């Protein structure tokens, strides 16, 4: 973008770069037999060095450059990703993908190549992550190699919040619930800032929110069981 490349093309290249990172991680895990977490750490560390090489420094401003900075573009990107993922998951390949995520042994018993499914999952997820990072950097007006730190907590919190508030729903509604969960999470962070809390404690607050969200289903089951026993 800073070199005058079309921002749409630059964003698409970022998506492809994320897919490549996911592919390498998947191959290290499935072919190299390196544990998933360790494979992810290895690729993430390598990507950090590659980003420094491409950017030339840790922080790069995008002010004055032609970039994608529009709410409608971000909303359109989210809706496009939702529709594409929903369509994919309803195909035969998508169903095999879901089966692998639910139960690897069962999927293998049906003749599904679970290794390929795992690589595919990493490719798609890392591509979407890179796309999100590209759009956020353009919206904020700068790119930083450390910008992705803590994003895993935000992602988990978004999924858990969506699962808690939207339990037994259809596939598309479940995908949309994750988006609602991410928006709700950002509102919680904004509320903490507005209340005057020290911003240095945001990651601590994020971890607490995630822990509470993870415990809500357990407490909900216990409460429902207690109510049912009292009713009997």
Regions found by a protein language model. Name each.
Residues 48-49, 76-87, 125-133, 156-163, ...:
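Hydrophobic core segments of alpha-helical transmembrane domains in multi-pass membrane transport
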Residues 6-8, 21, 70-152, 157:
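Helix-loop-helix "hairpin" substructures at the membrane interface of multi-pass membrane proteins
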Residues 37, 66-75, 118, 147-154, ...:
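Loop-to-transmembrane alpha-helix initiation sites
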Residues 84, 102-109, 113-116, 188-232:
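Cytosolic-side transmembrane-helix boundaries in multi-pass membrane proteins
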């Amino acid at each position: 973008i800073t070199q005058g490349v079309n921002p749409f093309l630059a964003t698409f290249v970022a998506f492809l770069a994320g897919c490549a990172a996911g592919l390498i991680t998947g191959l290290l895990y499935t072919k190299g037999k390196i544990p998933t977490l360790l494979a992810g750490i290895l690729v993430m560390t390598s990507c950090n060095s590659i980003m420094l090489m491409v950017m030339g420094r840790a922080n790069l401003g995008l002010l004055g450059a032609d970039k994608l900075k529009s709410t409608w573009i971000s909303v359109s990107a989210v809706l496009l990703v939702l529709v594409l993922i929903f369509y994919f998951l309803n195909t035969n390949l998508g169903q095999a993908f879901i089966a692998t995520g639910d139960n690897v042994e069962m999927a293998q018993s049906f003749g599904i190549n679970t290794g390929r499914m795992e690589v595919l999952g990493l490719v798609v997820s890392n591509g979407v992550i890179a796309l999100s990072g590209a759009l956020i950097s353009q919206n904020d007006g700068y790119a930083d190699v450390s910008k992705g730190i803590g994003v895993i907590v935000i992602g988990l919190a978004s999924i858990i919040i969506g699962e808690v508030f939207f339990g037994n729903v259809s596939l598309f509604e479940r995908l949309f619930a994750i988006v609602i969960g991410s928006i709700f999470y950002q509102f919680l962070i904004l509320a903490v800032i507005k209340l005057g809390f020290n911003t240095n404690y945001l990651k601590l607050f994020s971890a607490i929110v995630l822990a509470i969200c993870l415990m809500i289903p357990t407490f909900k089951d216990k409460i429902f069981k207690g109510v049912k026993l009292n009713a009997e």
